[in-house]
């Protein structure tokens, strides 16, 4: 089955690609007779042409995109439906084409306003089953000019001219074409299962053969019955009732799963779920991670300073012992003071007495300009000891001149 387009330069390849009777590469399927259903559990599946199975025999190009092929396989599996198909058959169908966390969304507009129904993986099998329970004997999807896009971990298929076609045999033969936008997300792996299914219905048409109208042309009552739609927005009453029921069933999936897993009573399951939901609502938001202050590089001391520090180790012992007391006094006066103690790195052994205390002030409330003119606090600083190099004044020019002759005489 192929439908051509009269427009110049227009190709009907995309329509042929999704024809339910033809595989994606255009080779015809074995003849399909309406009224005879194929079941994979009842009879053997018809053989495909060699070009459809083995890439090396008679096939020069791949059979099209993987998403196209998955839609064709979904239509083929739906054609195998029979009235004997039970819940296990529908669950296997859903497992084959839908992910474990898949979501199916249907949007349409009725007389009382727009509707939107979203169901999870557990309720998807019953949705497809409700279509056949509503009187449909055949179901397939036709996508025209779809757009495929690759993402990080999934492939999206967006078709603005998608159609869901169902055929009904009761009360009389009717073909229902539901037109809308179909958006699918396939996981980008070997199985290519659907993660997101969103079908936005715009309009629908119900087609009746002219032969039936000719048979009842003289019966006004029958013509009035034929003029009435058998669906609402392309969906049967069975499907609409199930979608309304899913509004209650979908939130209860967590309760049902907990009841099946832990064998709790419905009341206990409800209490547990409500308590966990309350904990998620009350839990404080995670605090943003604070940036750690960059560590300051330690300056290496020159050799002369090392010798002087080594030579004056005994003389400076008193100042080292005095520094902790003055440091703690300073920290007690100024609020928000951090005192950092580090062992000495130059000579000596690590111990209580031989230890260097480094004081670092970090106080946002402290104004550095106030201490510039305070000479008393500078003179009383613990760093200014008796033998501190900061107290020694540089020699004057006269003293340096008097020292030079003595040094020359000694030479």
Curated annotation (Swiss-Prot):
The keyword Phosphoprotein applies. The modification Phosphothreonine is found at residue 61. Transmembrane segments: none annotated. It holds the Pfam family LIM_bind. Residues 302-318 have a biased composition (Low complexity). Residues 336-375 form the LIM interaction domain (LID) domain. One of its GO terms (molecular function) is protein homodimerization activity. The modification Phosphoserine is found at residues 265, 302. Ubiquitinated by RLIM/RNF12, leading to its degradation by the proteasome. Its main location: nucleus. Residues 283-330, 367-411 are annotated as: Disordered. Signal peptide: none annotated. It is found in: Nucleus. The modification N-acetylserine is found at residue 2. GO terms for biological process: anterior/posterior axis specification; cell adhesion; cellular component assembly; cerebellar Purkinje cell differentiation; epithelial structure maintenance; gastrulation with mouth forming second; hair follicle development; negative regulation of DNA-templated transcription. Interacts with ESR1. Forms homodimers and heterodimers. Interacts with and activates LHX1/LIM1. Interacts with the LIM domains of ISL1 and LMO2. Can assemble in a complex with LMO2 and TAL1/SCL but does not interact with TAL1/SCL directly. Strongly interacts with the LIM2 domain of LMX1A and more weakly with the LIM1 domain. Homodimerization is not required for, and does not effect, LMX1A-binding. Component of a nuclear TAL-1 complex composed at least of CBFA2T3, LDB1, TAL1 and TCF3. Interacts with LHX6 and LHX9. The dimerization domain is located in the N-terminus. PANTHER family: LIM DOMAIN-BINDING PROTEIN (PTHR10378). Binds to the LIM domain of a wide variety of LIM domain-containing transcription factors. May regulate the transcriptional activity of LIM-containing proteins by determining specific partner interactions. Plays a role in the development of interneurons and motor neurons in cooperation with LHX3 and ISL1. Acts synergistically with LHX1/LIM1 in axis formation and activation of gene expression. Acts with LMO2 in the regulation of red blood cell development, maintaining erythroid precursors in an immature state. Belongs to the LDB family. This is LIM domain-binding protein 1. It comes from Homo sapiens.
